[in-house]
Amino acid sequence: MKELIKMDQFTYWFIPVSIKNKEYVIYKLIDGKVKREGKIGSVANIHPLTLQSVQGLNDVERVELLKDFKKYQSRPEYLALESIREDNENPINKYAYILVGGYMLTKQAANSDKAFETAMQALQWLNTTDFYEAPASTVYHDAHKGGLLKHTLNVVDCLADLIDSEPFNSVDIGDALVSACCHDWCKIRMYESYMRNVKNEKTGQWEKVQAYKQKDERFIALGHGVSSMYLANRCFSLTLECAAAIRWHMGEYNVAQNEMNELHQCNEQFPLVQLLQFADRLSITKYAVAEEK
């Protein structure tokens, strides 16, 4: 993670309002100094590559804007959205950018430099766990070393494909990224590897292959979604919608009968709840299709 250029060094703030299906990002431009004085800043949609669609700026202001955007390109918020479109980036770095930048994009963080410290502390905690090496399951999907990280990034990709579509285009981008990054944290330290005998269909010989099982002493005390929400809320200040999305991301697959009403109410009230459910299922479906080929 690069050294943070603090917001008080910017004349203009860049607030993403659309990922545009991962092709480019549309930003809302805010005059940072005016905003800090409590007034309404100037607003414009800009294309990050050209900045040509910004209206109402003179040549001096346009030069200042370009300088600010170049500085902004080292900020976690920018790196998070760029990482979504980078398929060849190191997956651990990609996840770090998306988690940290995603949290800094949330309304409760409000581009606060304090939010950067909070997110970095969460990363430091993750580094003490097996998150980056754990499987996503024992058999159903991504049941291999690093599978949990791979699945999480796939969910982020699916979410980015959906978020600009109705009815999800009102969802806060930061909340969406944080919920995707944290939705399966309950699986941290859940599995252990062992060697399993498997018959090679080509040679007919039995071979030992690495497999995973749930640790005997490990159980999810609060349930799948609630456990992930609990861990995420220990690290971040979550909005109710973000917390609900993590809590209910399994949809009807992990809900008691007497909880169905609460699930349906959250689906109706919070678009992010359904968005994360769809992204999670789409990721698993894509995995299954790829395995069949």
Residue ranges and their predicted role:
Residues M1, I46-F69:
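Ampiphathic alpha-helical segments that act as solvent-exposed interaction surfaces
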Residues K2, Y12-F14:
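Short, acidic/polar N-cap/turn motifs at the starts of alpha helices
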Residues Y27-V54:
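Acidic, low-complexity, intrinsically disordered interaction modules
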Residues N58-D59, V63-K208:
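Acidic/His-rich, divalent-metal-binding segments that scaffold phosphate/diphosphate chemistry
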Residues K6, I15, V25-L29, V34-E37, ...:
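Short linear proline/tyrosine/threonine-rich motifs used for host-factor recruitment
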Residues M1-E3, M7, K293:
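Short intrinsically disordered terminal tails
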Residues L57, A136-H144, K150, L162-E292:
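Divalent metal-dependent catalytic cores for phosphoryl transfer on phosphate-bearing substrates
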